[in-house]
């Protein structure tokens, strides 16, 4: 094998409430980032912990991160490549993992994260390592329901709020990426893999949409399940989806005010605020799992 094909790059594996990512320094030479993500994120043949301490293969995406610590606070340039090789403009849990990765390399506890959907501020409490997790809050920007921002089909000039799309009553909102949010009686009673793809590919969403289900819990929070565009399946957690739930709930009058709302995807609890006049926030734990080296140009 030629030296170019045999080249490997260092990586670390992080997860935020089960939403897991391969993290690679953005300065590492990876010639085809899409192919890299397709190979190493695969749930059956992708990245694995050689120690056996973590038995889940693959990942929900690859975070290519460039740390620019000459700024105060330090900046992180974040590029997320999904398992299908596509690029995502924003990922809430990915941004929280990016902040944890940077915190392990600096003495800073605050970072500015440059994403394709704008710059997000993150605050880190603690540093992940061993059995510890970091508590990280990231500002997510203001959710928008505007048709051009979601985006919705070009011939539509009104918001999509509590309308039926392919069998689900959904509300469309962009929280960095588009979400079709449906409130149901019990998220666990829905066959997500059966109902979500039709909505994800509906004509109403020319760029596709993540499909997020929510049901109200007894304590006033929400249970969550999300079928992610680019992953093309359910993930254990979706930060933009959690924010989308609270934004849609406010739009529909299910919650009001600026209070913190708990949203619980399968991977754990997240805390969300969607203020009337400011940026939404996403808070939750991040853990570092393991690291190693991966082929920079995996065989196709």
Predicted regions and their residues:
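Selected transmembrane alpha-helices and immediately adjacent juxtamembrane segments
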Residues: 170, 177-181
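Active-site/binding-pocket entry motifs
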Residues: 143-145, 288
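Flexible, glycine/proline-enriched loop segments at strand-loop-helix junctions
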Residues: 88, 141, 148-150, 183
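Active-site glycine-rich loop that binds ribose-phosphate moieties when present
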Residues: 145-168
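Membrane helix-loop-helix hairpins that form the core translocation module of multi-pass transporters
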Residues: 133-143
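Residues that recognize and position ribonucleotide moieties
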Residues: 22, 171-173
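A glycine-rich beta-to-alpha transition motif near the start of alpha/beta enzyme domains, typified by
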Residues: 1-133, 181-300
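Short beta-strand/turn micro-motifs at beta-sheet edges
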Residues: 11, 169-170
């Amino acid at each position: 094998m030629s030296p170019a094909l045999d080249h490997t790059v260092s990586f670390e594996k992080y997860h935020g409430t089960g939403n897991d990512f391969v993290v690679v320094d953005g300065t590492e030479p990876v010639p085809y980032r899409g192919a890299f993500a397709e190979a190493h994120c695969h749930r059956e043949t992708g990245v694995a912990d050689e120690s056996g301490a973590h038995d889940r293969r693959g990942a929900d995406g690859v975070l290519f991160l460039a740390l620019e610590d000459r700024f105060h606070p330090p900046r992180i340039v974040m590029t997320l490549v999904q398992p299908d090789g596509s690029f995502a403009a924003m990922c809430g849990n990915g941004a929280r993992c990016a902040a944890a990765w940077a915190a392990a390399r600096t003495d800073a506890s605050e970072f500015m994260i440059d994403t394709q959907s704008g710059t997000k501020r993150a605050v880190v409490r603690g540093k992940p390592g061993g059995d510890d997790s970091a508590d990280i809050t990231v500002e997510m920007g203001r959710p928008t329901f505007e048709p051009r921002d979601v985006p919705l089909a070009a011939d539509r000039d009104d918001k999509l709020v509590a309308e039926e799309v392919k069998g689900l009553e959904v509300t469309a909102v962009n929280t960095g990426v588009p979400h079709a949010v449906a409130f149901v009686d019990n998220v666990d009673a829905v066959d997500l893999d059966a109902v979500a793809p039709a909505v994800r590919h509906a004509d109403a969403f020319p760029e596709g949409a993540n499909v997020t289900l929510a049901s109200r819990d007894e304590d006033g929070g929400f249970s969550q399940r999300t079928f992610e565009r680019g992953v093309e399946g359910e993930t254990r957690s979706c930060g933009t989806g959690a924010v989308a739930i609270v934004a849609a709930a406010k739009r529909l009058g299910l919650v009001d005010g600026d209070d913190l709302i708990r949203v619980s995807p399968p991977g754990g609890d997240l805390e969300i605020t969607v203020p009337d006049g400011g940026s939404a926030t996403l808070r939750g734990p991040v853990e570092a799992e393991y690291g190693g080296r991966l082929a920079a140009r995996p065989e196709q």
